[in-house]
């Protein structure tokens, strides 16, 4: 059951990038169910710069793997620090009638427990001698941190070994009120920017001898701050320039500043990019003396809402839970972007996210069980469809 596995994982204080023996728990659970006469397994455990990653591949024994669809479950076992003021110990997995409490219950050990147990269900109940797909699990201990040596690094390794999946579910906590009410079928990109307006420092009593960068920018700030850079589309909200910091001067009243520095971020739709943002800012600033630096942290991506993975998940959720999931690209960046960069059809689905990174983080027992059941049904449907496809 996913509940007992979740409690076991919560008891491991895997604050980024610590792994705390979680992979051993998962490997033991999976390995105990592998029928070696029918199944080949391929395991990669890698550690780099303190980050530990696990890739576990299940494939039918002796099959031509180039002809099999490869589906992957992915997630991160690391959690953010707990802070103080918890009602329950954050690494105990306390359970009452409705909830399990602890750091990572929602983000995202709950999702991991659900898909690990779903895979175990398939291994226990399915005739693995006729498994028509490759099934894998990819886990990292560095998603909440810099993410350099986590999922991104592992996908680079998988590409070298020709083991990239064709489709993937990342079990991030995407839901709002109940498991399944929102799927993330894409994400906006993220572009950071720094703008420096150059001036000439001087005595405030002689403004004619100074060039005040604050005054230079003043009339133009309204065309930058909070401006929508495009109209968005049916899946993406408009790209918006959000100023996060403005600094100038020396905190004195008798010296005009030498320069003014603005830091900003754009969460961008596919309709905007570095070039279009630079062009827009240039058109606003005109001949002002300035220096602009832009850096793309992640690209926007979308998995088509008529793709098999999206249609299958929606159909299962509607049938089993009686709700129609909202297809969204909202929120921050996630490791799903790394899969998308390799052309993998990726969807994020998980438990609600109302308590992520918060004191007294908790997950509803019913939400965990619902997610587990969705994953089981998805795998069963995926296997059934693969068998039909193989018969054609």
Curated annotation (Swiss-Prot):
Zn(2+) 1 binds at residues 76, 107, 172. It catalyses: N-succinyl-(2S,6S)-2,6-diaminopimelate + H2O = (2S,6S)-2,6-diaminopimelate + succinate. Zn(2+) 2 binds at residues 107, 144, 357. One of its GO terms (molecular function) is metal ion binding. Its cofactor is Zn(2+); Co(2+). Pathway: Amino-acid biosynthesis; L-lysine biosynthesis via DAP pathway; LL-2,6-diaminopimelate from (S)-tetrahydrodipicolinate (succinylase route): step 3/3. InterPro entries: Bact_exopeptidase_dim_dom (IPR036264), DapE_proteobac (IPR005941), Peptidase_M20 (IPR002933), Peptidase_M20_dimer (IPR011650), Peptidase_M20A (IPR050072). Keywords: Amino-acid biosynthesis, Cobalt, Diaminopimelate biosynthesis, Hydrolase, Lysine biosynthesis, Metal-binding, Zinc. Binds 2 Zn(2+) or Co(2+) ions per subunit. Its EC number is 3.5.1.18. One of its GO terms (biological process) is L-arginine biosynthetic process. It comes from the Bacteria. The active site is at residues 78, 143. Catalyzes the hydrolysis of N-succinyl-L,L-diaminopimelic acid (SDAP), forming succinate and LL-2,6-diaminopimelate (DAP), an intermediate involved in the bacterial biosynthesis of lysine and meso-diaminopimelic acid, an essential component of bacterial cell walls. Homodimer. HAMAP family: DapE. Belongs to the peptidase M20A family. DapE subfamily. This is Succinyl-diaminopimelate desuccinylase. It comes from Helicobacter hepaticus (strain ATCC 51449 / 3B1).
């Amino acid at each position: 059951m996913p509940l007992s596995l979740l409690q076991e994982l919560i008891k491991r204080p895997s604050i980024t990038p610590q792994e705390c023996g979680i992979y051993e728990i998962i490997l033991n659970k999976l390995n105990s169910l592998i029928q070696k006469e029918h199944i080949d397994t391929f395991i990669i455990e890698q550690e780099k710069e303190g980050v530990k990653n696990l890739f576990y591949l299940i494939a039918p024994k002796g099959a031509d793997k180039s002809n099999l669809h490869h589906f992957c479950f992915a997630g991160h076992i690391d959690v953010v620090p707990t802070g103080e003021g918890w009602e329950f110990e954050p690494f105990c997995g306390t359970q009452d009638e409705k909830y399990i409490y602890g750091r990572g219950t929602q983000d995202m050990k709950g999702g991991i427990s659900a898909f690990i147990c779903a895979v175990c269900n398939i291994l226990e109940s399915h005739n693995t001698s006729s498994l028509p797909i490759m099934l894998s699990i990819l886990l990292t201990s560095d998603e909440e941190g810099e993410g350099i040596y986590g999922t991104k690094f592992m996908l680079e390794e998988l590409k070298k070994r020709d083991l990239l999946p064709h489709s993937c579910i990342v079990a991030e906590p995407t839901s709002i009120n109940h498991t399944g009410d929102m799927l993330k079928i894409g994400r906006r990109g993220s572009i950071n920017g720094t703008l420096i307006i150059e001036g000439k420092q001087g005595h405030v009593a002689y403004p004619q001898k100074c060039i005040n960068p604050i005054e230079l920018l003043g009339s133009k700030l309204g065309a930058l701050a909070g401006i929508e850079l495009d109209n968005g589309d049916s899946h993406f909200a408009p790209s918006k320039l959000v100023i996060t910091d403005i600094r100038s001067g020396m905190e004195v009243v008798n010296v005009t500043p030498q320069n003014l520095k603005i830091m900003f971020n754009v969460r961008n739709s596919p309709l905007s990019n570095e070039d279009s943002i630079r062009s827009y800012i240039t058109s606003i600033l005109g001949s002002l003396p300035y220096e602009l630096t832009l850096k793309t942290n992640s690209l926007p991506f979308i998995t088509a809402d008529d793709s098999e993975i999206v249609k299958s998940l929606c159909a299962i959720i509607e049938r089993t839970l009686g709700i129609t999931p909202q297809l969204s690209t909202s929120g921050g960046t996630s490791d799903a972007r790394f899969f998308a960069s390799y052309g993998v059809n990726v969807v994020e689905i998980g438990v609600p996210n109302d308590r992520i990174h918060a004191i007294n983080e908790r997950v509803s027992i019913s939400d965990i069980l619902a997610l587990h059941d969705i994953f089981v049904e998805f795998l069963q449907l995926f296997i059934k469809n693969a068998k039909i496809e193989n018969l054609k």
